[in-house]
């Protein structure tokens, strides 16, 4: 019988640990373009999954038909090579299992990534790009992530990117109860941000979105005022803090707009926190007197401080991952042995 084949699975990508936000935004895939990217990558593997979040862009490949690095370079070029990691076989599976469990996140233990992995797999499956191996690995990763959250305290009182942004605003402004907050965007992250602002006591929240109906839907659900993006500069002078979490394909706010808003609120600064990737707040805002601009990379200190209380759960979480990956490898070896026996039987007929 021929030797058993190794796990034909790989991941290539970058994340917050290997690339700053200005590099991550170069790799980010625009909403709606995922299908086109998947179709392109399918030339390099029989099964392909794209995981694209604010802190990572990763390509998972099963049934490889070429070099993973070449596959990534074909879509993004070589400019990002110095920030990429490549894992194969067991290491690639372990990576996805840790990602789904929130162990590889900027915010360790965060729960949003579980849904993001599930949607990435469902997108691949819907396009016929997830077969036996990718299905098994993705399902195993999701199950392992669920176990980590239910059997350890890793996700207890976990801070998310959204809550870290609100905590940063509190550190800058003090109590937020009598402050006005403006949220740019109306998606999942914007909804989480509004939830945390409400929990922090903010009474006045303005939700600004390109589609006013979507802004109104979110404002009506959690409380707030809705505003179409075309009126952003009219309401901006009211805002003490701006939290941006939109998937806009360009900067929606520049230094000149912030300068004009500050002129209408003398002696009252504006704190702006951009948790979008790509960023939608122009970095030139930093040069405006009275404006204080932050991005995802500035949240690291808050995230690290929050992790201290949950650090004891990490060894238990990692043990669950090792056990789950071992189960995957046993399945793979059994499957390969069965395929090998069939091949021998067919050859002898």
Swiss-Prot record:
Taxonomic superkingdom: Bacteria
Enzyme class (EC, first level): oxidoreductase
Coiled-coil ranges (or none): none
Keyword terms, alphabetized: NADP, Oxidoreductase, Porphyrin biosynthesis
Catalytic activity reported: (S)-4-amino-5-oxopentanoate + tRNA(Glu) + NADP(+) = L-glutamyl-tRNA(Glu) + NADPH + H(+)
Domain comment quoted from the record: Possesses an unusual extended V-shaped dimeric structure with each monomer consisting of three distinct domains arranged along a curved 'spinal' alpha-helix. The N-terminal catalytic domain specifically recognizes the glutamate moiety of the substrate. The second domain is the NADPH-binding domain, and the third C-terminal domain is responsible for dimerization.
Species annotation: Deinococcus geothermalis (strain DSM 11300 / CIP 105573 / AG-3a)
Biological process, per Gene Ontology: protoporphyrinogen IX biosynthetic process from glutamate
Binding site for substrate: 53-56, 105, 110-112, 116
Residues at the catalytic site: 54
Stated name of the protein: Glutamyl-tRNA reductase
Pathway assigned to this chain's UniProt record: Porphyrin-containing compound metabolism; protoporphyrin-IX biosynthesis; 5-aminolevulinate from L-glutamyl-tRNA(Glu): step 1/2
Oligomer and partners: Homodimer.
HAMAP family per the UniProt record, alphabetical: Glu_tRNA_reductase
NCBIfam families: hemA (TIGR01035)
Keyword Transcription: no
Note: During catalysis, the active site Cys acts as a nucleophile attacking the alpha-carbonyl group of tRNA-bound glutamate with the formation of a thioester intermediate between enzyme and glutamate, and the concomitant release of tRNA(Glu). The thioester intermediate is finally reduced by direct hydride transfer from NADPH, to form the product GSA.
Binding, NADP(+): 185-190
Sequence similarity: Belongs to the glutamyl-tRNA reductase family.
Site (Important for activity): 95
EC numbers for this chain: 1.2.1.70
């Amino acid at each position: 019988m021929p030797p058993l084949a190794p796990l034909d699975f790989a991941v290539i990508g970058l994340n917050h640990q290997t690339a700053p936000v200005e590099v991550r935004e170069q790799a980010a895939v625009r909403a709606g373009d995922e299908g086109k990217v998947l179709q392109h990558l399918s030339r390099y593997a029989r099964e392909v999954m794209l995981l694209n979040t604010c802190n990572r862009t990763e390509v998972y490949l099963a049934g490889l038909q070429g070099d993973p690095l070449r596959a990534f370079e074909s879509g993004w070029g070589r400019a990002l090579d110095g920030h990429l990691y490549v894992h194969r076989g067991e290491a690639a599976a372990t990576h996805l299992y840790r990602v789904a469990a929130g162990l590889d996140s900027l915010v360790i233990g965060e729960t949003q990534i579980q849904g993001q992995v599930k949607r990435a797999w469902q997108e691949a499956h819907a396009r016929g790009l997830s077969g036996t191996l990718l299905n098994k690995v993705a399902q195993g990763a999701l199950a392992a992530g669920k176990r980590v959250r239910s059997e350890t305290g890793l996700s207890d009182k976990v801070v998310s990117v959204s809550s870290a942004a609100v905590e940063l605003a509190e550190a800058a402004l003090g109590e937020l109860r009598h402050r006005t907050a403006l949220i740019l965007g109306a998606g999942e992250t914007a909804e989480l941000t509004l939830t945390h602002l409400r929990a922090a006591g903010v009474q006045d929240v303005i939700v600004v979105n390109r589609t006013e109906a979507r802004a109104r839907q979110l404002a009506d659900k959690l409380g707030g005022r809705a505003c179409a993006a075309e009126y952003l500069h009219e309401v901006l002078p009211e805002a003490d803090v701006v939290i941006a979490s939109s998937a806009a394909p360009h900067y929606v706010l520049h230094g000149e707009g912030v300068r004009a808003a500050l002129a209408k609120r003398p002696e009252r600064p504006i704190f702006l926190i951009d948790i979008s990737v790509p960023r939608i707040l122009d970095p030139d805002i930093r040069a405006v007197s009275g404006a204080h601009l932050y991005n995802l990379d500035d949240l690291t200190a808050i995230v690290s401080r929050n992790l201290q209380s949950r650090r004891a759960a990490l060894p238990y979480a990692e043990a669950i991952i090792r056990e789950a990956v071992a189960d995957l490898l046993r399945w793979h070896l059994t499957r390969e042995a069965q395929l090998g026996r069939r091949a021998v039987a067919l050859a002898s007929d």
